[in-house]
Amino acid sequence: MLQVHRTGLGRLGVSLSKGLHHKAVLAVRREDVNAWERRAPLAPKHIKGITNLGYKVLIQPSNRRAIHDKDYVKAGGILQEDISEACLILGVKRPPEEKLMSRKTYAFFSHTIKAQEANMGLLDEILKQEIRLIDYEKMVDHRGVRVVAFGQWAGVAGMINILHGMGLRLLALGHHTPFMHIGMAHNYRNSSQAVQAVRDAGYEISLGLMPKSIGPLTFVFTGTGNVSKGAQAIFNELPCEYVEPHELKEVSQTGDLRKVYGTVLSRHHHLVRKTDAVYDPAEYDKHPERYISRFNTDIAPYTTCLINGIYWEQNTPRLLTRQDAQSLLAPGKFSPAGVEGCPALPHKLVAICDISADTGGSIEFMTECTTIEHPFCMYDADQHIIHDSVEGSGILMCSIDNLPAQLPIEATECFGDMLYPYVEEMILSDATQPLESQNFSPVVRDAVITSNGTLPDKYKYIQTLRESRERAQSLSMGTRRKVLVLGSGYISEPVLEYLSRDGNIEITVGSDMKNQIEQLGKKYNINPVSMDICKQEEKLGFLVAKQDLVISLLPYVLHPLVAKACITNKVNMVTASYITPALKELEKSVEDAGITIIGELGLDPGLDHMLAMETIDKAKEVGATIESYISYCGGLPAPEHSNNPLRYKFSWSPVGVLMNVMQSATYLLDGKVVNVAGGISFLDAVTSMDFFPGLNLEGYPNRDSTKYAEIYGISSAHTLLRGTLRYKGYMKALNGFVKLGLINREALPAFRPEANPLTWKQLLCDLVGISPSSEHDVLKEAVLKKLGGDNTQLEAAEWLGLLGDEQVPQAESILDALSKHLVMKLSYGPEEKDMIVMRDSFGIRHPSGHLEHKTIDLVAYGDINGFSAMAKTVGLPTAMAAKMLLDGEIGAKGLMGPFSKEIYGPILERIKAEGIIYTTQSTIKP
């Protein structure tokens, strides 16, 4: 049975002359800050005791208060709005600053004793109005133990809530349990009703009705105070057995499913000195920084539900960090085997009830309290995000900071029992007189936080703490993190926009395009620096040395130059481009410098890697193997803007795009290596795409796909292909350019600066071997012959003006000239937008023998007069990785791509908030 400590009502502790009674007035103010705050500091029985002694008690009316106003009136209280007559005003939580009355004595939980920033405005107002504040939290006995607290009821309500939450979470994981019939604490009229629901659930557990595949449930209680005792009082109503922490591992694996197991954790169970793994309580109290917690390795892996009731102080070890959570969410080594319909738990740790509600405290990743309205959230350690659901990956979290308000009547009565013996001396407080003149007991006197417009000596440390924090914040703002962005092309804008959201990041943009950086400087708060890194390596090194991070958005051939500067100055770096062999050669130097360089963070390469690795890692977690992987990606004009012979438009230099058709490609198909030569024969490798039929797509293989068997860790795959998507007709048009000799990077005499200007007609005449003075029809016939009689390719050349008298742009080669020409002809207009299409296909063989065909589709559109789809999908993931490095979310060192969960997990989640959405679909065949 739930046992709650109560103090009997006796005569108040201070004897007064009756002549003073009429002057001393007590008021109980209504709670008006939180909608769920239905408690009061005193119950009617306490009011009756006070009024019987001749004191006047005012009760501010409140329909929200759980105990009815009429019960207070019946006990002798006077119901009225105006409480200005009172010399002592009691509440539970803080009043609004505008409702404070000067030179009164107030008693409530102020939450100011740690110089909490959120309540410093309240403290200032209290000091200004010369209010005497008695803080319940500091009412302690000679041992330092609190004599007035709601702690036990926080434990009771918190335990009821987390049992309810576990019922919901386990159901989301595929398991009906007896916990489903336990409601939230506030759904019960009193704790006795809640206890009966817990007992009913316990009876079903004792009958063996818990799912076998989830294994024995273990509950760990931290601390031995009132909070822990209250939680244990509810837990004890289940068929439970308490074990020592060192026994937890065994019972979590082989325990009896007809009971649940509990462990009460004290400091000596998990704290050890860093040097010799010994715990010395006296030393720990003085030097907690010398100790570490082994909770993450010795206790947490065998814990189903953690009930945390301890607060965290600076320099003390945390129970769990973000990194701990990531390892704990890995599939359990000792989980019972599951089958379809009766799955095993994805990991042992299912839920945490952080009754301390200490954000960023002993549970580092509990960064935000939940509420009674929204009591649960899920912490996904892989993604390092919190989402409001009981579904998906992660740990169920409950961290309500006003739990006793869920059982307001009993909490009020119990709290009032503890406060009652001190009320009379508090009523006698005269806030207009010096504190030293008051006849207070040590319990009350030492709880006075403010008096006569000052902080008593005991609490002057609050101002010191406050000033220290403000100095730290000022220093933090003064030491802004510095980022150098190299390159000012269209990809740079989403990067700058994303990083600029953090006002503590100082951004420098280096580029040889002076006009571009000037335009960027008008839109974003940046430091523009005009420079050509190829010619100003010394300036590059000087700039890099002053940064915390470098983002290179330059052509890939320049990345090694930037990387060398980063290595020399030990500065981290990210880039969206491929990790080239030249960059790979610097791998050892990167490791020796102890820095992080992450490449391939854009779209392709980038998001394609991340989506692939997420699927592959999840498959491996369940023991499945990848049999096939095919990925196609393309940047295209939106369909309505594709009306040209190439069905394509350019947002940057076409050189790379045009050269792709001249590059060979290698891929694996059904266990056989297929080699595709570049040039004219490349057209034979083009395949019609049957997904998204409305887009009329074609695809062709890209570079060497076979190397990804090792990179992705999928040597089991018999098919590996990465390719490029275009609208149908694109490759045929480019094939015509190849036939005509336009995809040629060789320098020609006719392109020298001293040569006479050349028209496209003259150039084509030369390429097809006829006189430059030939008539148009003669040229047309010769070109058609060169194209093998393909009229479609001829029409494309004519549409682009390649048979006309337009002057060829000055360039080093025909390819460079063609690129400049295509930019003029096929650039995006101001009202035109692009799109990104990506399709990943996987063949996944499960341990059961079933073959899963899984597809991932990512389609994104550019914004008219905004960022293009290409800029967003390349720039944002790059910026996110940069921010993660700055924030310490990525701990790995060396040269790497986004192949680890530490990198791809958060990025894949965060791109959704930016409107980059991907969808998945699976079909399973026997």
Swiss-Prot record:
Keyword field: Acetylation, Mitochondrion, Multifunctional enzyme, NAD, NADP, Oxidoreductase, Transit peptide
Catalytic EC class: oxidoreductase
A cellular-component GO term for this protein: cytoplasm
Residues given in the record as NAD(+) binding sites: 488, 512, 516, 533, 554, 576-577, 603-605
Catalytic activity: L-saccharopine + NADP(+) + H2O = L-lysine + 2-oxoglutarate + NADPH + H(+); L-saccharopine + NAD(+) + H2O = (S)-2-amino-6-oxohexanoate + L-glutamate + NADH + H(+)
Tissue specificity statement from the Swiss-Prot or TrEMBL entry: Expressed in all 16 tissues examined with highest expression in the liver.
Record pathway: Amino-acid degradation; L-lysine degradation via saccharopine pathway; glutaryl-CoA from L-lysine: step 1/6; Amino-acid degradation; L-lysine degradation via saccharopine pathway; glutaryl-CoA from L-lysine: step 2/6
Induction / repression: Induced by starvation.
UniProt cross-references to InterPro entries, sorted A to Z: AASS, AlaDH/PNT_N, AlaDH/PNT_NAD(H)-bd, NAD(P)-bd_dom_sf, Sacchrp_dh-like_C, Sacchrp_dh_NADP-bd
Region (Saccharopine dehydrogenase): 477-926
Location of the transit peptide in the chain: 1-27
Top-level taxonomic group: Eukaryota
NADP listed as a keyword: yes
Modified residue annotations for N6-acetyllysine: 48, 56, 93, 128, 138, 286, 458, 523, 535, 584, 707, 739, 761, 780
Localization per record: Mitochondrion
Span list, region Lysine-ketoglutarate reductase: 28-476
Domain comment as written in the entry: The N-terminal and the C-terminal domains contain respectively the lysine ketoglutarate reductase and saccharopine dehydrogenase activity.
Subunit note: Homotetramer.
PANTHER family per record: ALPHA-AMINOADIPIC SEMIALDEHYDE SYNTHASE, MITOCHONDRIAL, SACCHAROPINE DEHYDROGENASE
Name of the protein: Alpha-aminoadipic semialdehyde synthase, mitochondrial
Organism name: Homo sapiens
